[in-house]
Amino acid sequence: MTETYIKNTSKDLTSAIRGQLTYDDKVIEKIVGLALENVDGLLGVNGGFFANLKDKLVNTESVRDGVNVEVGKKQVAVDLDIVAEYQKHVPTIYDSIKSIVEEEVKRMTDLDVIEVNVKVVDIKTKEQFEAEKVSLQDKVSDMARSTSEFTSHQVENVKASVDNGVEKLQDQKAEPRVK
């Protein structure tokens, strides 16, 4: 009599299934962008003229703006244009960026980061950077609020003037001017 043993392990099952896991560039760009949010001394990733203009017009900050990647089957290369904080040591910022990008991409995708190129396109104080983040949308909202307050005040003035005019007319109506 022959005995048959069936070995059922997850490794055997996965090795029998063929397929391929790939990542779109924007997925890796998003991982990199989110990973960079808490790097000390990194104020922002510069998305270029049009991305920056978009951010000035409307409050839409995409974590992918300014992050460019090249994704292969096993490796990733990353290019960044950054704004560094004034009086911070830029090589330390660069080392932090490389470390966190490599760690997060590897942890989430098993891809190896083989290159991280960083170009410092500007240096600003935190105050300068925050002041420049005020968008046109914010300015329009502030103007609308100010206009609304001014209009409300003017409406109250007009109501008071009309009420005074009505009272005067009623006083004049009570006594005829000519007898």
UniProtKB/Swiss-Prot annotation:
Superkingdom of this protein's organism:
Bacteria
Q: Where is the composition biased (Basic and acidic residues)?
A: 165-179
Question: Which residues, if any, are the signal sequence?
Answer: none
Could you tell me which residues belong to the region Disordered?
147-179
Q: Name one Pfam family in it.
A: Asp23
Q: What family is it from?
A: Belongs to the asp23 family.
- Know the name of this protein? Stress response regulator gls24 homolog
- Organism listed in the record: Streptococcus pyogenes serotype M6 (strain ATCC BAA-946 / MGAS10394)
